Amino acid sequence: MSEVMIPMSFEQLVDWVLQEKKKRGTVFGQHHAYRADGTHNRTMFGRTLETPIGPAAGPHTQMTQNIVAAYYAGSRFFELKTVQIMDGEELAACINRPCIKADDEGYNCEWSTELTVPQAMEEYIKAWFLLKVIAREFGLGDMNGFQFNVSVGYDLAGIQSPKVDTFLNSMKHAEDTEIFKHCKAYLLEHADWFEHVTTEDIEQIPPEICNSVTLSTLHGCPPQEIERIAMYLLTEKGFHTFVKCNPTLLGYEFARKTMDEMGYDYIQFGDFHFKDDLQYEDAVPMLTRLMNTAKERNLEFGVKITNTFPVDVKQNELPSEEMYMSGKSLYPLSISLAAKLAKEFAGRLRISYSGGADYYNIERIVDAGIWPVTVATTLLKPGGYQRLTQMAKLLDKENAPFEKVDAESAGKLAEEAVKDPHHVKAMKTLPSRKMKKEVPLMDCFVAPCKEGCPIHQDITTYLQLVGEEKYEEAMEVIAEKNPLPFITGTICAHNCMSKCTRNFYETPVHIREMKLKAAENGYEALLEKLPVPAVTKAGKAAVIGGGPAGMAAAYFLRKGGMEVTLFEAKESLGGVVRHVIPPFRISEDAIEKDAEILRKMQVDIRCNTKVESLEELKKQGYTKIVLAVGAPVQGSLKLESGMPKNALEFLAEFKQTDGNVSLGKYVVVIGGGNTAMDTARAAKRNAGVEHVYLIYRRTRRYMPADEEELVMALEDGVEFKELLSPVKLENGQLLCKVMQLSDYDVSGRRGVTETGETVWVPADTVIAAVGEKVPTDWYQANGLAVSEKGRLYVDEKTLKTSDDNVYAAGDGLYGPATVVEAIRDGRKVAEAIAGEVLARDFDKLAEEEKVYAKRGVLKEEQKETKEAGRCLGCSTICENCVEVCPNRANIAIQVPGMEKHQIIHVDYLCNECGNCKSFCPYSSAPYLDKFTLFATEADMENSKNQGFAVLNQETRRCKVRFFGKTFIWEPEKPAGLPDGLGRMIETVCRDYSYLIR
């Protein structure tokens, strides 16, 4: 695998664009075009702009195909990737890879173009021609409705060097360059390929590629040097000029305070760059002088906000010591600097903006008179370039010419940014979106929600049915694998939502709520039609424990044709859910409805029946026994003095007394999990309680509780006291040690250390939510083998214990877990006993056109069943790696005989930025792990990827590497390669020939 990108010839690019558009209706993977009708045009630098947005100088403006994809989707202003005297392999060798991480806020450790400067010039001129012809050919807008802006750096000597000077001259007047002549001649020679582009159109393509420039300088560049370069670009080169300014102009204290208040306290940076970079008191007079110089020459001058914001690598984000922050966390700094300069110059200083712009703020930015606006981080996320279409359409409105920046509006944007939910960091560390499996070479499409669900619910299928208001059908899908739709529709830990691809857009689909909607509307019909399985299996099964695990085991055993008796020690089914979880979390009615499903299945339910002896059950004729006894042994917290109350004991008492437990005025809850949150919220509702303090030895970011549980606790008025460790309880006061977070370890995790300080916290009652334990003594009394930790020895596949006829499920295995994990265990046990699979998959594929229509479209939570429509249909089409690749190096191909699109990685287009790794739902990196097309045998030898190099396109003869073996493959001699991979190779040779160099 080589990180060196190889530009495509103009011939190959034209062939690719025309073939793909004709065969598939797409252009470089973009399914929907933005079409400008000319009624919303703006004018800048004497040229037309159909939209004031486009890609920032960076990964999306480095290659021709990147620029074309961005244009097709809606861009009209292109800030071309920065060129400097260091280029090509020399520069590429300085970049550590992977160099991009954009799964939440963005980071990168790349900088200027990795091409040589002459290559960059050629890429931009090829793009210039392609945009001109597709504008006319595909009806996308006026051939002159877009602008290129060159970006150069980093010092005057480099910019005046022959290499960069030739680049600037060529971009200003390209008619004498060989590439301009070649592109024009090629288009004229093949003018008959076009339906709408004429030879006259081609002849009139102007050679004046750029008349504007953006200056980028390195951190620490002296103000005198910045001014000299800008003056040179204005006076000697005659460019309209933007100078990039950094957030460091705001000062260290402002930046640190803003980041901390917004939840980015973990982002580390010192004050070095703030002191070393351009200072505000130097910037203002410099910018004033440059504005005056530009005005004297009838040119425009402004600032580009913002340049990079360097931060320290602390959690192994990227293989570098320093990286550049972008996206949602950069926005509050960038817009604050824009507001500050707008006020300083009374709006007279033009601002070209980049720094966390996206669909949710771009309209307000432009309305404030801040444009053009360029984006990068948002395009690196799923949806990719297609996100531009939504932004461009949003700005389809009457446009006034630029007069000045509205300083007041810019100030409001800055004020709003620090509280904007799209920019504030989540309270907790984000969970991994990855599955614990590697991406396959074929058929990698997957619904991450289903894979993340312990019972593999067919989520996309029932969401589609709920969206169509087919509740009965949705319930049939749900109940196939889940006998507790009301319980899981109310309190499920919903790991599915953590895996939802929508997390990379805005917020996950509210899957749990959609399940509950199906249950509320389809329950009666399901119950009426629910078949009662005949008893077809010999023997009887006893299930001990009527909590979620026991209920699930009984349900699936009945589905499997077993006669089942369910023993529950208490008066009703539900276990911890019914007897402990507070009523404000789940109602008795919801639990009872799930219990009714078991009754309909004719499970013999025996409440108020405590089982002490397994031998007694065997004597009663039960041939198989399932232990779903939970984790009833109370965990303990040892203090030097004083005895805390157990959380589950309190919650049960709270429920029994309707919130009239004797607690006093001050209650302290110790713990940071979901049970601790339930406990604190219940205590807050308890009669006589005035203050509830939740104590945890680390910060809330590291609490194990789900974020929504933390939020609800805070909303209920629970007072969090972080970085405290309890010592002793005396006279209504809890003594705590004050802790502090230590630095990050090699895994990126922060520990805690003692500070030596202590504090007293008022505490009439202390409640410890520190976890429960399995009933080891009971297991041993019944002859079952346990580990040193007191846990049952079980077969991981069947959950069979040391007794061949006894199985275990739920919390009784390893301690407290989730309801849906209990259901998983219940089914696993039932299938082991029944000897058959007891639930089938429901794969209802969404229509491809409807799936693609949602890609790149940001949409917040919708009301009622419309929320189901936010599902991206990943079970039908995933293609995250295709969408997020700036270079179009991951291609979705349609292979005859294969149901879904297959992914091919194109080696020569990849620079190993690693962005596709962040968004692949597998624990894999598509650029390393997908079947790869190599341009040459030499390229193949320089890589470890599995893939192929085409030796003879006509005969389809290829050199192939497959699982470590390299061999010659031909369609007539396919031995050694799976049929599907052979089909993929043939398809590339036949239908995607433009990929072959």
Residue positions per predicted region:
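C-terminal helical cap(s) of enzyme catalytic domains, especially alpha/beta-barrels
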Residues: 88-108, 380-404
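Glycine-rich phosphate-binding active-site loops on the catalytic face of alpha/beta enzymes
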Residues: 76-87, 245-247, 364-391, 931
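Glycine-rich dinucleotide-binding loop and its adjacent helix/turn
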Residues: 519-535, 593-608, 613, 634-686, ...
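Ferredoxin-like iron-sulfur electron-transfer modules
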Residues: 432-452, 474-494, 526-543, 578-579, ...
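FAD-site-proximal beta/loop scaffold in flavoenzymes
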Residues: 642-665, 729, 744-816
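Glycine/Thr-rich beta-alpha phosphate-binding loop at enzyme active sites
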Residues: 22-38, 251-347, 382-400, 641-642
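A conserved FAD-binding loop/helix module that cradles the flavin
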Residues: 812-837
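Iron-sulfur cluster-binding cysteine motifs and their immediate structural context
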Residues: 447-469, 489-519, 565, 572, ...
